[in-house]
Each structure stands twice: as C-alpha cells, then as structure tokens.
C-alpha cells in the first residue's frame, strides 16, 4: 500500500513539474510573438513590456545571461526610431548596469581601476567604468529634454507601475525619468 502511495505521489509531482515546464515554454514563445508583433506595429511601449518580460524569464533560468541582456537592450535602443522610447531604454540600461554592479560589487571593487581601456565584457569592468557608464546612460535617458517634457506619461501606462499620486507628481516622461535617474544614482 505504501509503495502505491509513493508511486501515485511521484506521478502527481511529475505531472505538476511537466505542467510548469510546459507553461514556461509557452510563455517564452508567446513573449517572442509579442516582441515581433510590437516591432511590426511600431508599438514601442509594448516592445519594452515584452523585453522586460523576456528578461525576467531569461534571468529565472540563468542569472549569468545578464550581460547579454544588457547588450540586447542597448541594440534596441540604438535601432528604435522613437526618441521618447529610446530615453526609456537608456534609463533601463542604466538600471541594469547599476543592478549588475550592485550584485557583483564585492568582486568589482577588488579590481584595480582601469583608465583608457574598456573591456568588451562587463564581467571584467572596474567600479569606475560602471559609474561612468551608468552616468552616461542616465544622461542619455534625459535627452531630448524638450520632447520628453512634452510627452505625457500616460502614453506609457502599459509599462509603468504607478501610484495614485503619480500623475500629479510626474505628469511628463521627463519628470518620470528624472526621478528615476535620481533613484538609480
């Protein structure tokens, strides 16, 4: 009787695990479709949302892919035609560099600072390189200032988690990104 109970329990656990893997695999393919659709329809808020979802899913599988994900977002920022969305992507990139630095701070701070040379792989960077890159990305996230000041934050409701006072405190994209830059630094 105990053997049957163990076998039944093992089958149930296997069924649950396989269901979880199936759901995760389906989410990934759905997410890839969302990225392709957002690119085709030039819906940059949807593209940014799909990128965020894909990055979260990828990081759940393998934390070591973080540098590659940063490069991917940099590629999207370099090819995106919408200046306001490019500013958001630069803000995301700054946050990603900051998060990577914070997660690896102990190792990074043990290295001798580099001057005049920037390794391609951020796993080899020193603290001064991270600080400079984060500052550069935050500066880019606030440009073009005039356009960002005229862009209502409501255009990006899809990707924002706002509190009830957000429209009064940060009515434009520039306000939002400026507060975000302060938080990141």
Residue ranges of model-derived segments:
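Hydrophobic core
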Residues: 12-19
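Ser/Thr/Pro/Gly-rich low-complexity linker/stalk segments immediately outside membranes or between
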Residues: 24-29
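Extracytoplasmic/secretory-pathway proteins
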Residues: 31-185
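Transmembrane helix-loop junctions and nearby membrane-interface residues
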Residues: 22-23, 103
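N-terminal Sec-pathway targeting helices
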Residues: 1-11, 23
């Amino acid at each position: 009787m105990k053997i049957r109970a163990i076998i039944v329990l093992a089958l149930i656990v296997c069924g649950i695990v396989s269901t979880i893997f199936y759901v995760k695999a389906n989410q990934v393919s759905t997410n890839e479709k969302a990225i392709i659709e957002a690119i085709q329809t030039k819906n940059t808020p949807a593209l940014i949302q799909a990128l965020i979802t894909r990055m979260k899913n990828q990081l759940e599988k393998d934390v070591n892919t973080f540098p590659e994900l940063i490069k991917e977002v940099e590629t999207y920022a370099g090819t995106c035609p919408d200046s306001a969305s490019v500013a958001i992507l630069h803000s995301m990139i700054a946050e990603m560099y900051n998060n990577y630095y914070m997660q690896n701070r102990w190792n990074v701070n043990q290295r001798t600072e580099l001057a005049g040379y920037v390794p391609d792989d951020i796993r080899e960077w020193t603290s001064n390189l991270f600080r400079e890159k984060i500052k550069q990305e935050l500066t880019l996230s606030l440009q073009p200032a005039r356009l960002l000041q005229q862009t209502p934050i409501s255009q990006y409701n899809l990707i924002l988690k706002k509190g009830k006072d957000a429209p009064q405190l940060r009515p434009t994209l520039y306000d939002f990104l400026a507060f975000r830059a302060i938080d990141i630094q």
